[in-house]
Amino acid sequence: MIKLTVDDKEIEVEEGCTVLQACEMAGVEIPRFCYHDRLSIAGNCRMCLVEVKPGPPKPQASCALPATNGQIISTNSKMVHDARKGVMEFLLINHPLDCPICDQGGECDLQDQAMSFGSDKTRFLENKRAVEEKSMGPLIKTNMTRCIHCTRCVRFSTEVAGVNDLGALGRGESMEITTYLEKSIDSELSACVIDLCPVGALTSKPYAFNARPWELSHTETVDVMDAIGSNIRVDTKGNQVLRVLPRLNEDINEEWISDKTRYAIDGLKNQRLDKPYVRNENGSLEEADWDTAFNKIKDNIDKIKPNEIACLLGDLVDVEAAYAAKVLFQKLNVDNIDCRIDGAEIGEHGRVGYIFNSQINGIDEADALLIFGSNPRLEAPVLNARIRKRYLQGNFPISLIGENNNLTYPVNYLGSKSIDIEKLRDKKNIVYKTLMDAERPMIIVGMGALTDDSSQALLYELRELAEVFGVIKKDWNGFNVLHTSAGRTGALDVGCLPSKKGLSAKQIFSESVNSSLSFIWLIGVDNKEVLNLKKPFVVYQGHHGDVGAHVADVILPGAAYTEKNCTYVNTEGRPQFLKPVSYTHLTLPTIA
């Protein structure tokens, strides 16, 4: 431990800390623009200057200065105040000062720090620099004249996202942040640069000019666009969801979210189901009241045997809805209920067989990884960023069996066919050696493997290999299943599976073509296989007029994930509670 003094307060910090981190531990807030906890140190904004003794007779950049024993640090002296005022003056020399029309206004670091450390007068009378706008795709709006060259966006895209699409060209006043070839940022996490930008140089295009921060209501909830369960904040104004921002959760998403999580909200106001519908004698859907819809369902279900009835649960079904469906169909003596609409062969051998056992933060402790039948970059971008972070720390060989789809880290590629699993038994193979030598090896099994025709045999062989490589030990279980849907783990937990004599989802879709089923209840099921449901009477319960609604005989509208209190269980088996967003005036669709 290192002892040092911050503003006359003696503290102890661990070796390797910077002066800025030491000041924060002492409860002193240091202004900064370029420094970020999760990015490398750049030290180029100079806003974090402090006075350090013993040392040079000038202020030092605290973000890049290592803390050493016996340092006396002053953060509030006249020297520090003058230095910060001077730095702020330089930063504002070329800034357009267009706060009234800037989307960052009201939550801008430059605004806040200019008020705290800047001057109310200017000495700069020359023309300001103007920079041509850059094209960064449909999500990121640029106004590079506002840029202060903190390079947070460049470091994020290179270090966290793993794409080298952003960089700085030129020096001094001529320096510009650019995508080099005027192209979109090729990353599933690209819009995180909006959150990182301390000024209004990078803002959200879909959110542009919609609202000011103080006009918004905030609701802390959880994302359902993948199975990770990223923690998010949903901002609303009136009856509209305007934006989604990440919330800090070190165990799950740290402080990143995917672009899909951030921008899928535009679907909340399009193609919504707002009333019950019943198909008439002419084959057309017409509006109905709830009594008519339920009577239509009752009339059909009363004259059908239980073995001719089935219920399928979609990818976005919450735990409460899944449990209610299970109880309802159990009372009807129905055996044909399934939540595995993609045909995955999981859930029949205990909970450890279908969750991410090591937990997401367990990636930080692993020392070797085998990815089997999964593409984390597309299926779980936040988890993929965590794998990349662990790779950058070193001593973390990664192997892949499956489609080699340009992951953001190098892999030992073994092939894309299920038969390639046999290569793991070859003692001369480098992958065999790395997994055998690892103390905490990890296997991530994706839905690509579990929906394969030979998935049961593959799963058995993978578990056998996991024993050989020591993936499962007394104090470590690195055998992980990566789901792609938010509702799957919770539905499996409450037992939404067919009985021994029941039909699975894969069988239901094929059997319905053969007319063995007469009644199917779909809860949020919208995959293309439902188009095969020609003969059965179909009830669709959901919130959007998607594929399932098109084949339905009765439609019951429901609430989307932002509109109800409910529970989701993420891929690691962690239950998380969702809250309805803070609409100030909105009549929701009559909720099924």
Which residues does each PLM region occupy?
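Conserved small/polar residues in nucleotide/adenosyl-binding loops
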Residues: 584-590
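Short, contiguous acidic and Ser/Thr-rich linear segments
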Residues: 11-16
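Short beta-alpha connecting loops at secondary-structure transitions
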Residues: 5, 69-75, 177-182, 409, ...
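Fe-S ferredoxin-like electron-transfer domains
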Residues: 46-223, 228-232, 238-240
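Eukaryote-biased recognition of intrinsically disordered, low-complexity regulatory segments
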Residues: 1-7
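Serine/threonine-rich, repeat-prone extracellular segments and beta-strand-based repeat modules
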Residues: 33-42
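Catalytic alpha/large subunits of respiratory electron-transfer oxidoreductases
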Residues: 92, 96, 143, 150, ...
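Short, structural beta-strand-to-alpha-helix junction motif
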Residues: 17-21
